[in-house]
Amino acid sequence: ADPDQLATDIPDLDMVDPDEPASAELIEMARACEDAARSIEGITNSDGAEASWGHSSVTLAATNGFAGHYARTDCGVGVSVIAGEGTDMEGEYDFAHAVYRADLEDAGAVGIRAGERAVARLGARRMSTSQIPVVFDPRVAGGLLGHLSGAIAGPSITRGTSFLKDSMGKQIFAPGIRIIDDPHRPRGQRSKPFDAEGVANKKRALIEDGHLTTWLLDLSSARQLDLETTGHA
C-alpha cells in the first residue's frame, strides 16, 4: 500500500466491554433462554442453550511501516428447541450477540422467539408455484446482504465469477434502496478501524437508490481492476 492509503488516525470504536461476566452469570443467561423457549405451548424438547463471552485482539505490523492494534469483546446467547411429536416435529433456533453485554437482547426474549419459530413451522404445506410479494424475515435479509457483499468482492470480480460482474452503476435493487457499509460504527459487531492490509477504511454507500456504486476491493484486486482499494482486505 502507498503511505497515503494506510490508516494513520485509528479511531476508538468502543469495542471492548470491561464488564466480563462470571461463569455463573452465563449459566443463568443460558438457563433463562432455554426456560423461556420451553414455556411456549407446543415445545416438546430442547437441543440446548448456550451463553458466551469472549475477548479478542488484532495486531498488524507490515514492512510498509504500518502498525496498528484493536480489540473487541463479544457476548452472546442462543437456544435450539423442538416442537411437536412423532412424525410432526420441527426444530428451530435463535440467538443474539452484542459487543457490550448491556446491549445484548434479553435472554428470555431470544428464547421466546426460538420457541415461537419452532411452533410456527408445524403443519407447513407446500405452496403452488406462483408470483407473489415476499416479506423477508430479518434473519433471511441478513443472508441476502451476505450474498451481495460476496458478489461485489474484488476477487469475484477479477475472476469473472460474480453474477454482478457487469452491473456497476446499474439498478439491482428497487428504487429508494440505500445500503451502507460502516466499519466505524461504535460497538458494531463487525466494525474495525483498518482492514487486514492496514489500509484506512470508511463509511460508504454500496447501493444508492437501488444502483450499485462500488466494488469491495483489497490491494490486489484494485490493482487488477486499475482502481483504488476500498479498504476491504
Residue ranges and their predicted role:
Residues 1-202, 208-211:
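Active-site bordering "gate/hinge" segments
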Residues 211-233:
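C-terminal, non-catalytic macromolecule-binding modules
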